[in-house]
Amino acid sequence: NEAVEIVGEEGSWYKINYKNSTGYVHSDYIQVGTGGVSNGNLSGGTTSVSGAISNSEAYNIVFNAMKEQVGAPYVWGGSGEYLTTNSLNELKLRFPEDAAYGEYIHAENYVNQGYRAFDCSGLMQWGFAQAGISIGRTTYSQINAGVEVQLSSVQPGDLLFSADLGHVGMYIGDNQWIESSYTGDYVRISNVPWSYVSRARRVLN
């Protein structure tokens, strides 16, 4: 265990300073010491954390987890569950209108083959969760995660959103992002369509 400084709290997540970096760690990984958290109130003291990671380490975890899913089919409502006959049927029951519209026809070709199911925000939620970071399930939740940054200042790990909040991907540098794009397509790394992107949020800060 190593000592870290708690600087904030959001639900079951602590915002901490660790090795000159700031990030979020779930309370399950925090062991409170003297001058740390007392009776649920923050005192700004130090405590210890098991497995705390820096922002750069968190980004590597998130990026590598998402990169491993490149080629997985886009599935409306998918949030990282394995794409099986049962899971696809459950999605069809949850989203009957989308199923009737044909949203799941493409995905049916990939069931029971070891693929995970992702829509755009599902990929982001799942990827960040691999580093213990909660950003919410939908684009409408994720647009409130972290802090707003200018598009001219984006850095790897930032979330990029379309103007209507209908799509989200993660910037990975060199004008590229990783996304689960749309029905009939796949998780992929591609050039950022900057004319389509209107907002950015920095979760790793």
Task: Briefly describe each language-model feature range.
Residues 1-30:
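SH3/SH3-like beta-barrel superfamily modules
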Residues 2, 157-158:
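Structural motif
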Residues 12, 73-81, 135-141:
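Surface-exposed patches in mature extracellular/periplasmic domains of secreted proteins
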Residues 18, 162, 203:
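Active-site beta-strand termini and strand-to-loop segments that position acidic
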Residues 30-68, 133-152, 166-167, 172-205:
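Aromatic- and glycine-rich peptidoglycan recognition patches
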Residues 40-121, 126-131, 178-180:
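N-terminal capping segments
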Residues 116, 152-153:
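Residue "hotspots" at secondary-structure boundaries inside conserved domains
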